[in-house]
Curated annotation (Swiss-Prot):
Range of residues in the leader sequence: none
GO BP of this protein: iron-sulfur cluster assembly
Family: Belongs to the iron-sulfur cluster assembly SufBD family.
Name of the protein: Iron-sulfur cluster assembly SufBD family protein SE_0610
Length: 465
């Protein structure tokens, strides 16, 4: 019996377009497929060697025995590379019409005109559009799709590529290393501070598609950058796979904020590795919004290498029927007087499952380090579940660690108070949820906060009755 596409009602991003690709690899993962990807991109020999070595690692490494159910993920039924257009365009008018219509629906041109210093749009396996304000280029900022950076900035690229997340890190990092395509490459020179966000948007359009972007950000000494990414996919009856790798290097006194708003359809496996190295007095902020997907497994990681380095993760996860959000954070304290903060907000409804999974590690040299963890979960019905799985490793007796976890339901007292003011039960529940996520949305740029609130309100529709 054929599978039915998931019922997502009026899911805004669930539309899909006709296949307009100019090349599509055969399904399945082989040395020939990996070699074909590298040859089509005209990569140097060292990158092909890296890919093939990663493929061997992928075959050898076991599947994770923890987290969500991956038993239905069939690596032989995935298309690993789809080339949607001949090359990356610098003018929106030159993007192929069918692809442009998709991004018009998603509001990318409007967002670029109003809010952004630079924007990159990836469709399937390749970046189809990329633009950056000229004045940023004059400051020495590099913002390119990752493939272009490999061709045009090979020495800088090679210095940092796979230095934070090696291919052997985990099975899905190995998979990404073998078949990576697209993503963003950012370099901000010493003491250059960029306040206006750079944005990338990742769209899966095809069925049984794998998207494997690789993002690499380097903030040199005293630099700062704010990067925002958004992700969506159509609704299909079969599964797609999104397995990205993000590597960030925060040099001395530098600051990076990395914001993700994902709203995948619930046929997408979202299995992502994100890690940053933070040097002396550097500051790394992860702001992570997880909606949709069949299964998300994502744990942004800060490795605090230099004295006074700071790391923080602020995340929200929303799981509804048939969805598992297995998310959290990792903070690795390797140096004295480092500090970290984790604030995790989770919501589950209609049988959805949310899991906070986190690690805080204090090494032997982490004298005076401190970490604060807050995990709050709101469960909206009796069918939904929540788990909190913290793991703390302490190898230094001169540290401070605080951990607070709270699970709650919408109380009858709260509802009664609001309903006595003439507010319906559904509106009252929505107000309580919006108040619950306010610590997250207030950290977003205004236009993203508005969109996040709209997405949460959409998820809340039909929660009562």
């Amino acid at each position: 019996m054929a599978k039915q596409a998931p019922d997502v009602g009026d899911y805004k991003y669930g539309f899909h377009d006709e296949d307009v690709s100019i090349f599509r690899s055969e399904r399945g993962l082989t040395e020939n497929i990996v070699t074909e990807i590298s040859k089509m991109k005209e990569e140097p020999q060292w990158m092909l060697d890296f890919r093939l070595k990663a493929l061997k690692l992928f075959y050898k490494m076991p599947m994770p025995q923890w987290g969500g159910d991956l038993s239905e993920l069939d690596f032989d039924d995935i298309t690993y590379y789809v080339k949607p257009s001949e090359h990356t365009e610098r003018s929106w008018d030159e993007v192929p019409e069918e692809i442009k219509r998709t991004f018009d629906k998603l509001g990318i041109p409007e967002a670029e005109q109003k809010y952004l210093a630079g924007v990159s749009a990836q469709y399937e396996s390749e970046v189809v559009y990329h633009n950056m304000e000229k004045e940023l280029e004059e400051k020495g900022i590099i913002f390119k799709d990752t493939d272009s950076a490999l061709r045009e900035n090979e020495e800088l690229f090679r210095e940092y590529f796979a230095s934070v997340v090696p291919a052997a890190d985990n099975k899905f990092a190995a998979l990404n290393s073998a078949v990576w395509s697209g993503g963003s490459f950012i370099y901000v020179p010493k003491n250059v501070k960029l306040d206006t966000p750079l944005q990338a948007y990742f769209r899966i359009n095809s069925e049984n598609m794998g998207q494997f972007e690789r993002t690499l950000i380097i903030a040199d000494e005293g630099a700062s950058v704010n990067y925002v990414e958004g992700c969506t996919a159509p609704v299909y009856s079969t599964s797609s796979l999104h397995s990205a790798v993000v590597e960030i290097i925060v040099h001395k006194d530098a600051h990076v904020r990395y914001t993700t708003i994902q709203n995948w359809a619930n046929n997408v496996y979202n299995l992502v590795t994100k890690r940053t190295f933070v040097h002396e007095n550097g500051n790394m902020e992860w702001v992570d919004g997880n909606l949709g997907s069949k299964l998300t497994m994502k744990y942004p990681n800060c490795v605090l290498l230099g004295e006074g380095a700071k790391g923080s993760t602020l995340s929200i996860a929303f799981a509804s029927k048939g969805q598992v959000q297995d998310a959290g954070a990792k903070m690795i304290h390797k140096a004295p007087n480092t500090s970290s903060t984790i604030v995790s907000k989770s919501i589950s409804k209609n049988g959805g499952k949310v899991i906070y999974r986190g690690i805080v590690h204090f090494g032997r040299k982490a004298k005076g380090a401190r970490s604060n963890i807050e995990c709050d979960t709101l469960i909206l019905d009796n069918e939904s579940t929540s788990d909190t799985i913290p793991y703390n490793e302490v190898f230094n007796d001169n540290i401070s660690l605080e951990h607070e976890a709270k699970v709650s339901k919408v109380s009858e007292e709260q509802l009664f108070y609001l309903m006595s003011r003439g507010i319906s039960e559904e509106e009252a529940t929505e107000m309580i949820v919006m108040g619950f996520i306010e610590p997250f949305t207030k950290e977003l740029p205004m236009e993203y906060a508005v969109e996040m609130n709209r997405l949460i309100k959409f998820e809340m529709e039909g929660s009562i009755g």
